[in-house]
Amino acid sequence: MQNKVYRIFVINPGSTSTKLALFENERKVFSENVFHDSAELLKFETINAQLPYRMRVIRDFLAENAIDLTGIDAIVGRGGSSYPVASGIYEVDELLVRHTRESRGRLNHVSNLGVQLAAELQKEYGGRVFTLDPTVVDELCDLARVTGLRGVHRRAIAHALNLKETARRHAAFRGRRYEEMNLIVCHIDGGISVTAHEKGRMIDGNNAAGGEGPFTPTRMGGMAVTDVVEHLSRKTPAELLQLCTEGGGFSSHFGTSNADEVHRRIEAGDEYAKLVWDAMVYQICKEIGAMAAVLYGQVDDIVLTGGLLRFAEIEQTIRERCGFIAPVVAYPGELELEAMAGTALRVLRGELSPLHYTGRPVWDGFACEKPNA
């Protein structure tokens, strides 16, 4: 039904704001980044406890802007920490909502609110509910899962939604299919994901929320275990985990995660700010080199995306350090809202069948590792 106009509402919760957008087919009718009072958010002990507050903010925004979602065709929420899943668009059901709320994927992240908010709005306005490429998309190759401790496996935690969409759009830009290219794709923002994509599968990458890879404006990044243990003597486990996702990186060095503020310090001649900034980009480049090895050096392009690319020197430094690996192509900003709406539209038009959440992780250990193997 190509002539039918489908209305699609998209919800993308972030740490201090919620991005909302309404699409009519491919046309974006509006998009808004609704910021939340930080003092209000600090009152909530858990991410899930924010749900009523964020629902109220969304409803107030819709009312204030005279936006009526009655008859909406689809509501799409950013996917969170259910059990690990294959890449794709999922029709949201009660099981997926419950497992996300319970954080079965062991990631306490604000993205867990996406499908919960969408499901709540569905009760009021109807329509179908979807989620696309959640943070727990798991396509890791076997070698990427193994650690130096038996029974402890690396997990796939990345900005899968933006990484996958940017990779697909870049392949189209090259006149090729994503499934026939080898790419290193980097999401560079408050969190940083550096990932290896082999023929359409994201086979390796740093677990940014778990403390792997480069430090970021909010995350401490990878550190020697001995240093972490020494630091733990002065911190509780909860406080240390908080450094992994919120209180590390720029927040630790400067007392702010605001990259614009740190950049202003550099422009004013702050040598320490420049040192830390350059070290972050240096670590991104190191991670890109690691992903090149994952792909045997057979890399078609290095693709950059994310909000921090508004600072041109980040792209320039990556070109200088990593350009010998493959061409570097940048897509500043993010494509998450467009990805969610566009893929839902394909489902509504009958061009794509949604996946259904099974309630089981897509990978559940090595058979050869089990005691009776």
Model-derived features: where do they sit?
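Conserved phosphate-binding/catalytic loops in two-lobed NTP-binding clefts
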Residues: 312, 316-342
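Short beta-strand-loop/turn "lid" adjacent to the catalytic site in phosphate-handling enzymes
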Residues: 62-110, 128, 136-148
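Phosphate/pyrophosphate-binding loops at sites that engage ATP/ADP/AMP, CoA/4′-phosphopantetheine
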Residues: 60-73, 173-177, 288-300
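Adenine-nucleotide phosphate-binding core of ATP-dependent small-molecule kinases
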Residues: 242-297
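Structural signal for terminal/edge beta-strands and the immediately following C-terminal loop/tail
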Residues: 332-373
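Glycine-rich phosphate-binding loops at beta-strand->alpha-helix junctions
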Residues: 299-318
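Short glycine-rich, Thr/Ser-proximal phosphate-binding strand/loop in the N-terminal lobe
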Residues: 8-49
